């Protein structure tokens, strides 16, 4: 998949969904030569193209290991590190931004990781159309855009309608792990997840950061500036 072809796919999606409220903005970002080369040479091995019908994740990974969905991986550094720490778990990583996709593919190659597959598409459509019910053991959404202006809150990804779409895809006993450095968004996340009877908080409110989640450079810089970070881990109980 070339970056040009994927841009056309995204343009077609926008044309077909003019009234959709999306949680992301498609930025014009510079793709380095190394990132583009990674897409050109590694996509066939580690990329998954969007389809509007359910996909067999075990077949796509070539394994029956537990499956984790990661939505919004940025430049992919944390995703690659989590996959390295959890080699017996498969990760389906979704983002819309080309440089991040290229960088994650590059990291997969450099670290000899076999347990990541990458998609460049709107995660909401993937959840709605590609993921089979009960196919996921966990869901990671780390540092989604907080859309801090009140008039933009409707763009936030973590809202009840989206969680309602995710829940059927999650096995009983599976978990949802969210993280944010925006306190007001953390409160909203807590309220949204707590509103579902089929989800149980694993902590009294916010959870300690699990060992598998590395600290990102952005997160470390925020902590130096006195910013907090909030993790939430909820388990599906029914």
UniProtKB/Swiss-Prot annotation:
Protein name in the entry: tRNA (guanine-N(7)-)-methyltransferase
The answer to keyword Methyltransferase applying to this record is: yes
Query: Which GO biological process entries does UniProt record here?
Result: RNA (guanine-N7)-methylation; tRNA methylation
| Keyword line | Methyltransferase, S-adenosyl-L-methionine, Transferase, tRNA processing
Residues involved in substrate binding? 149, 181, 216-219
Q: What does this protein do?
A: Catalyzes the formation of N(7)-methylguanine at position 46 (m7G46) in tRNA.
Q: Which intervals of the chain form a coiled coil?
A: none
The UniProt entry, under HAMAP family, shows: tRNA_methyltr_TrmB (MF_01057)
Q: Which CDD domains match?
A: AdoMet_MTases (cd02440)
Catalytic positions are: 145
Q: Which gene encodes it?
A: trmB
**NCBIfam families (alphabetical):** tRNA (guanosine(46)-N7)-methyltransferase TrmB
